[in-house]
Amino acid sequence: MFRLLRWRLGRTLLRAAGRRCGGCTARLLPERAGDAGPGAERLRTRGAPARGHRVLPLLAALAWFSRTAAAEEQPGEDATDEAEAEIIQLLKRAKLSIMKDEPEAAELILHDALRLAYESDNKKAITYTYDLMANLAFIRGQLENAEQLFKATMSYLLGGGMKQEDNAIVEISLKLANIYAAQNKQEFALAGYEFCISTLEGKIEREKELAEDIMSEERANTYLLLGMCLDSCARYLLFSKQLSQAQRMYEKALQICQEIQGERHPQTIVLMSDLATALDAQGHFDDAYIYMQRASDLAREINHPELHMVLSNLAAILIHRERYTQAKEIYQEALKQAELKRDEFSVQHIREELAELSRKSRLLT
């Protein structure tokens, strides 16, 4: 049985939750150092053999949208007092350190910002700093610390009068659910996803009564957040081997992303591949091929940053459909792309898959 693997989680905040799980026919791709979460161990199910072709986990360095949960609480750029001006500069330095992959420096700067925020009793600065600290802990895999910091952020937001159905509260709740998923706390994870999805679906239903030109941007953000919640929940359901439910979640997420972002958006391509993986895990190889073929076509058109991984995914599904010659050609194309991007991890994986395909071809001749 050839193996099919999921993409790795999306960028920044979601990345710490670990690699996306393999389908039930597959073992997970070995983790890279530093990753955590449900994918940290290898899974083997349905008697999958020790070797076999699998879909690479994509880095998926893409976001549904980039706003942080407490963005609306960010201190103003036009600070009138010296303390707030200093806090703003510290926060800018911290974010720059995070972008430069200097987490230790960012953490020290954020602690200085938090101290100043408390000393000046600046509630917005306190909230925003907690949010940044929580996000930093999350991407570093410090899940227990991140959980407490996200809860502190939520407490300040709610204490400041923000409603429970506000997108910022739902986004933090999603991050908490992802933490519980990474910790294999199934009851808490599923309850968190259910809260996020039901809250946003109810909010969207109520907003349908508004005129089309009222708060259109806010409604679009709500739809995108719902898509992100569906995506995260589907990922966990697939990990939990609830395949048909995962498929339905991915179908809804893909529909939202296509409607709001468009078919050529990088995140849409990610979701097409994810849905294909869920279908493949259920043995629906022809349906999986349709989605993965479309994802690869679009990835080529837009020069997707993880094109080589999309192609590797496509090759694995072709093998499941016993299209070995075509699979070899796609793997070779994927290898060239991986070498161009100097992705040594993917290069090694694709070479292993080509070697396995050669062994299988010799057995069939």
From Swiss-Prot:
Proteolytically cleaved by PARL. It is found in: Mitochondrion inner membrane. It comes from the Eukaryota. The keyword Cell division applies. Its main location: mitochondrion. One of its GO terms (cellular component) is mitochondrial inner membrane. Belongs to the TTC19 family. This is Tetratricopeptide repeat protein 19, mitochondrial. It comes from Rattus norvegicus. The gene is Ttc19.
